[in-house]
């Protein structure tokens, strides 16, 4: 028996949501020291740019569909030319939610992941060298994600 608190946290995308729902459906009664979570919903994710099948950029709610950890990075990392890197839709998943009702959601990924990784490493290196100031307000979404973990046992889930 695990006595310490245990947290499983998944991306706020279709894969993560599917994994969370599978666990909740498989095991109905979790011990009080376990939490099964998704990364938090962020307001801007309700109308985030996505690439429609016709190639046009359209806003869509990417919660439970495409909000991977990269989306929680500062805007300066996930934007280019003043615009957010759009989400590319990949596959459609059938998911049984925690009420055992089937949902169909598309799994999406942020475009230009390699560029985002490069920009993140570049920012980190500049901050470490003292060439750039760490601005707490730029990391508000990552802070919210970390608070989801840190405070997971403060509220009943």
Q: Could you say what each language-model-derived stretch is?
A:
Residues 1-2:
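Short, surface-exposed loop/strand segments
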